[in-house]
Amino acid sequence: MLIPKRVKYRRQHRPTRSGVSKGGNRINFGDYAIQALEPAYITNRQIEAARIAINRHVKRGGKVWINIFPDRPLTQKPLGVRMGSGKGPVEKWVANVKPGRILFEMTYPNEATAIEALRRAGQKLPCKVRIIKKEDQF
């Protein structure tokens, strides 16, 4: 699972989901990529599920890059606990994703197989995504 090794502060304020991605919206490493079309919190489990979906479909011969990291903690109080008495424990780690952000990149010799693998990975994510190619970028 993807979680930070150590953090300066264990609990943080909830990150904002408004606006568009300022950086990380170009393909740098691979030939194909998944791009987010709406804001979302993507958990470490969802990132891992998408990565496994890609690897199971392509098997060998390609390379996958994960461009997001779940570095923000989300806290939640246990069920049946009254209001007050401090902030709850960390429930999960999320990556704050804004529209336009490249989530995964990959390279693979066969285009149809690569696009199908990214489509399967996109179904594991909680936001609308699109698949883009490196040559389609402006």
UniProtKB/Swiss-Prot annotation:
Residues 1-16 have a biased composition (Basic residues). PROSITE patterns: RIBOSOMAL_L16_1, RIBOSOMAL_L16_2. One of its GO terms (biological process) is translation. Pfam families: Ribosomal_L16 (PF00252). Keywords: Ribonucleoprotein, Ribosomal protein, RNA-binding, rRNA-binding, tRNA-binding. Belongs to the universal ribosomal protein uL16 family. This is Large ribosomal subunit protein uL16. It comes from Corynebacterium aurimucosum (strain ATCC 700975 / DSM 44827 / CIP 107346 / CN-1).
